[in-house]
């Protein structure tokens, strides 16, 4: 098979990030320099982001049988790269105080980003599995990066063991689907799995096992038990990546699989997804109420947010594609910037590394009185995650409710409204604590010039985008409408 220049251009983000991995690896081997390796990482990711402009010029195409590059993959590739950039930026000041090797952190983030980019373009079960493993394996190292702390090491081992079990379920599910359909490509699966085949036991068993494997990666109920422990144990910049890039990439590929393979037209599959969605929304929100650890709280809230998104997967079968696709694009963009801001504030408060992160809610008590702008940013992020009007989070929730109503998914829409009402309590609890009287002695605090650091700039840009796109969302909606898959 000969690769044309157009195909090479279509693969530019993947190639640039892959090349950056090699350059950073050689740089570490030549000389350990934290600043140089961080700079190389950020330059590589920025070039990958800029290359999306040229990818758009060559038009949608199947680059290989495993990869399909179109507007859909470009949009989610952009989101994954932005999340990876933010993670690297937050990691730099955190690693300044880290006593061991710092440079490998960037290498692991780049490899995980490579897996995420592959997932957004995956058009085949082989590339889906390869992308998930490429994304997941570096996370074992990243979660346990602060290995001198027992909790970080425990989180890494817990994630590794459960992830291995989930991958085996996913692989076995794929094998059952292949045994029945004779194809591994999404399009081939869609063509061979006709309506009559959907109800065959092997197909349903295969789909069920894939839902188990993917449900773990997306931390959906009942496969979510690892989430709060891992979010709490992982360093704050790694929790940022876990909450954003890994969830966005995996959800993007799941959505593409559901669009091409109508095997999910099965009433049984739709019922299972609906139950998982409602359980995730209620469990995530109810468990977050009692949390005093902000990373655990955001971990539980991410379970609820993925539950809201799962409604779009159910609606794909009952609705034309346009609205579910728009909903997922707008919601994930809002979730990305809100999470980057929230975890960014936690990362800034936890930098430089001094052992445990600033994760207790008590650490943020009275933040407004000595860091008013930072507390304003955190307030905006909490309001956006709660879905309050004038924020981007509200636009995403509005799309989810509108889609649920138009698809006649009344009880799922009711779950969204109920979940949002519960969520409002604990998001406002975090917000109120920022404005209480501060403690006598500060446990952790950000540097006085935090807004001039790269991490501070990322947090401020996220807050501005959440507000501006919350008031005037049309540019984002237009971008999402352009990001349509090549059918």
Curated annotation (Swiss-Prot):
Alphabetized InterPro entries for the sequence: NADH-Q_OxRdtase_suN/2, ND/Mrp_TM
Keyword RNA-binding in record: no
Topology in membrane: Multi-pass membrane protein
Chain's role: NDH-1 shuttles electrons from NADH, via FMN and iron-sulfur (Fe-S) centers, to quinones in the respiratory chain. The immediate electron acceptor for the enzyme in this species is believed to be ubiquinone. Couples the redox reaction to proton translocation (for every two electrons transferred, four hydrogen ions are translocated across the cytoplasmic membrane), and thus conserves the redox energy in a proton gradient.
Primary site of residence: membrane
Regions that span the bilayer: 8-28, 35-55, 78-98, 104-124, 125-145, 159-179, 203-223, 235-255, 271-291, 297-317, 328-348, 376-396, 409-428, 451-471
Coiled coil, from the record: none
Stated name of the protein: NADH-quinone oxidoreductase subunit N
NCBIfam families assigned: NDH_I_N (TIGR01770), PRK05777.1-1 (NF004439)
Alphabetically ordered keywords of this record: Cell inner membrane, Cell membrane, Membrane, NAD, Quinone, Translocase, Transmembrane, Transmembrane helix, Transport, Ubiquinone
Pfam family, any one: Proton_antipo_M
Keyword Transmembrane helix found: yes
Family membership: Belongs to the complex I subunit 2 family.
Assembly information from the UniProt record: NDH-1 is composed of 13 different subunits. Subunits NuoA, H, J, K, L, M, N constitute the membrane sector of the complex.
Listed PANTHER family: NADH DEHYDROGENASE
Compartments where found: Cell inner membrane
